[in-house]
Amino acid sequence: MEVLMPVNLGLDEMKRVVEKTNGCMVWGGSLNLAPADDMFVRIEHPLSIDPLLLPSIMSKKKAVNANLLVLDIPTGRGTKVKTIGDAELLAKDFMELGRRLNIKVQCAITYGEQPVGYAIGPSLEAHEALSVLMGKANVPDLVDKATDIAGILLEMSGKKNGKSLALEILKSGKAEEKMREIIEAQGGNPQIKPEDIPLGDETFTVRSVKSGYLLWINNASLVEIARLAGAPKDKGAGVRLHKKIGDVVRKNDPLFTVYAERDIKLERAIERVKESYVLGIGERMEMLIHEVKELPVPKKTFMLER
């Protein structure tokens, strides 16, 4: 969001924006809230919780006096939380810590085995988000996740049918209107359009060498490629996907494009592309793997040990 407006607001500036717009978008590091961490470590000790992960998140929520909080826990290969079981345990820890801090917490365990939307990198993500808000782009998984999480928060605040309400707010243009109001209050250009957001001039597009379906995406590799291209420090750098898991892929179709602001960084990213398994393309996976119709002949004597 730093592409659209200043987000390194001080506490007084944040209060001013909230009082004016009933919302804000800030970088927590600019508020100097970390000293509260010590108190949370003492609270967490009897819960046997990681003394770093939870306080780093919850301390800042308590410091700004949040009373309702929705936490997104992306889950799956390529994420910090690999299984739904682990995600549920983490969610319970967050909720218990929230109870002790008088913050009502709910968690959304979300699918994390591919990027949300098609963009990785500050300008690319801002371009995509603004396009969706304006109704100019169709990004189903981004809309689905955003309205799911917004819907949970709406229901926590007493509204009914939260997801449907969130979708209506998005489709009606009210979400875009509020975003532009916040952009203006925080010193950005409220008239900004997606095409006004500069992207890196240096690009490289990876194309498929065969036809099939996109079966998997290596999130960690994509993030590393975006980082080598210059993101997030270089706002115009990053990766834009052209295909998502399950999409049909034909030979020579574009799979993703790397953006960089400097050619030397693009070259580094391209080297990593060549070294990595970024995407998996093949035939659509079937549920039946293999039929076993006859008792297999053992290769050695079967012995039951007690």
Residue ranges and their predicted role:
Residues E2-V64:
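Phosphate/pyrophosphate-binding betaalpha-module
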Residues S48-L53, K60-R306:
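Well-ordered secondary-structure scaffolds
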